[in-house]
Amino acid sequence: MKDLKQCRIEIDAIDQQLMELFEKRMALSKSVVEYKIDHYLEIIQPEREREVIEKNLNRLNNDQLKEYARCFIQEMMTVSKSYQSDLLPLELDKNIKTDFKKDPVVGYQGIAGAFSQSAVENFFGEGTKNIGYRDFEDVYVALENGEIDYGVLPIENSLTGSINDNYDLIRKYGFYIVGETAVNVSQCLMALPGTKIEDIRQVYSHPQGLAQSSEFLYQHRYIEQRPFQDTAMAAKYVMDSKDSTKAAIASPLACKLYGLEMLKENVQNKKNNRTRFMVISKELICPKESDKVSVIFTLPHQVGTLDNMLQTIKQSQINMDRIESRPIETQYWQYYFYIDFEGNMHEERIQRAINKMKANSTTLKVLGNYKRA
């Protein structure tokens, strides 16, 4: 058995060699990233990383050290990518827009009286020209075709969580988030004038409206729930039906607009019910007072990649507000990740943090930088 002092002397000598090799390796990493920048190549290349790991593991003489060696190599590459990310140019275009178009046309899902219409007025002001569309995707198509300048769509409810369709659609169409607003949601039961609750056999509302009112509906289980495209559309449908066995769950404004009678206010499960809406645009707009960044990214399908990304965010000292995952349709059990964090893209530290995130992801896109609601 070797003497402890002698072991430490030999370890110190090896560490010295490692530091010399470390400096050489990092110098080569710098050359690699400079080449990739000049030739417009992706910084992260999962196939190359797998090749490096396997090639080095095959060089081991002691198979019992294989998993330790794997961790060592992966950590070495993580450090290399972090260094490379610091060498990337900062990408914010100084000519990027900071102001919205004057007198815009804004699209939303639903009809007059919808919560989405209230969100339009909250963000752009009363009197803004707005157009309602039947489905969420119709708003994206209208924006794509130039029928509208911006769209306002729900992204999250404080009770029922994310509206996943809009996470998927903003990725599908490649649009940007340029703002957000929140609307207090008061779900109300309404029907034709003179109707009593015990007369009702069907209730119509958007699936979110039904979900948010689940406790009330459980108490009235004899009423059949009928999902509808929109809460305000449901109110209009009930009025047009002239059927006193039908009711809608919608906003007080919809009740007033469509001449229905309010049977019960605030039937939602919790009174503090709010929906957050995003404002979408075909082009990126970063108002100077922005304090929230949204990004979407994918990761190599390897152990520890999500943890590495979260560590990158932590080490960059940025406060993450939210993380959401959505399946990649063409790849089993792999995901798109959406995160929101505090910051302004005009700050150098935020741009450098995003560069580090890019170095740890397969793909990454900034969805927007805007003022939080």
Regions found by a protein language model. Give the residues of each.
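Domain-level signature for soluble enzymes in the chorismate/prephenate branch of the shikimate pathway
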Residues: 1-373
